[in-house]
Amino acid sequence: MLVSIANTFGRIFWGAVSDKIGRYPTVIAMFGAVAGGLALTALFKGEGSILAILGVMLVALSFGGFLGSFPGITAENWGVANVGTNYGWMFTAYGVAAIAGPQLGARLAQSNNGDYSMAFYIVIGMALLGIVLQLFYISKSKKA
């Protein structure tokens, strides 16, 4: 239930942040929140750990924000004429991740005696890569 609440609130919270600082800096902040949340979860994964729960909620908060931010980003980059179709293609990444992520995480855990930490660290790296790619995109966009 807490994850659902955080996800729902994330759409509103990150939308307000985006209105203040812009879409792309908000995406960077969300990737940072995902990395931080996953780090808390990986480091404090003991049952009932408040910090692990906070980490999961940070990730859920950001997932809601990504879903709220991507339609505007899609329209900005490819126009509004086909935004529904284009957003559908962008959103497909969530579907692929929903299928592949748990399977890959489970395989990593199996090879590490049931410990999911390696899966968390890989996704933290992916979130940090997201920040780098977003910064690269911003720098290229300003030059164009």
What are the functions of these language-model segments?
Residues 4-12, 95-99:
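Residue-level signature of mid-helix packing/kink "hotspots" within the transmembrane helices
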Residues 17-18, 104-113:
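Interfacial helix-cap and linker-helix signal at transmembrane-aqueous boundaries
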Residues 20-31:
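Cytoplasmic membrane-interface "Motif A"-like loop-to-helix N-cap segments
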Residues 32-46:
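C-terminal ends and interior cores of transmembrane alpha-helices
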Residues 51-65:
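Hydrophobic core of transmembrane alpha-helices in multi-pass small-molecule transporters
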Residues 65-78:
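Intracellular juxtamembrane helix-capping segments at the cytosolic ends
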Residues 75-83, 113:
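Paired intracellular helix-loop junctions of major facilitator superfamily
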Residues 124-144:
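Multi-pass alpha-helical transporter architecture, strongest
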